[in-house]
């Protein structure tokens, strides 16, 4: 079983600095401890936050949306994480790379960066690929280290690099916040992604559910922060 979630943030936010989830994790809390996870499941999420001991920001801005990587070391992490989202670069390029290295170092597979747009793996005898991109404006940098707003030809090129027999999943950070339905542009783009060969689209960012659509026998989901969808490949 493939189990998908949306954005996962393990840091304190602006409004709960000092008592948010990042602080609780630093004090020994594991937010994943009660998840019902079976041995044959593959859990996938989008890592939206920063785990680094460096930041380009000063003062309060340097503390929020960031935890020390050691804080996350003992969590019961997801199997696979995407790293293409509009908060990933909030503390700079070095912090982004530290985050990626730390999470991958703790045993999770990672995707969605400029250097590693996709990851391919075997699951229950089936080849599965995960590709990540972000279409949201990045307020923190003009040169994101994640796969940002690619051209159609770049997407087609990445798709062609994946194994022909793979079940191809696309994680895409997009959409308007707090709007409970996708835009016509999102729908059109998602249909094109299915038409060129992706098997499943998992969208996130708006902070609310935007429903799902079956298109040509394949599915397009718009998930929120911790929503869960099970898919049997």
Question: Where are the model-predicted features located?
Answer:
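Conserved beta-sheet core of the metallophosphoesterase superfamily
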Residues: 78-80, 184-233
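Active-site environment of divalent metal-dependent phosphoester hydrolases
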Residues: 11-14, 51-54, 84-100, 115-120, ...
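Binuclear metal-dependent hydrolase catalytic cores centered on His/Asp/Glu-rich metal-binding motifs
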Residues: 13-33, 62, 66, 123-171, ...
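N-terminal catalytic scaffold of extracellular/periplasmic and nuclease hydrolases
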Residues: 1-84, 90-92, 168
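Generic structural signal for hydrophobic
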Residues: 74-76, 103, 161-162, 193
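Active-site-proximal segments of metal-dependent phosphoesterases and phosphodiesterases across multiple
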Residues: 53-74, 166-199
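Binuclear metal-dependent phosphoesterase catalytic core
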Residues: 5, 37, 116-130, 218-233
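Structural recognition of the beta-strand scaffold that forms the well-ordered cores
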Residues: 3-4, 41-46, 79-84, 110-112, ...
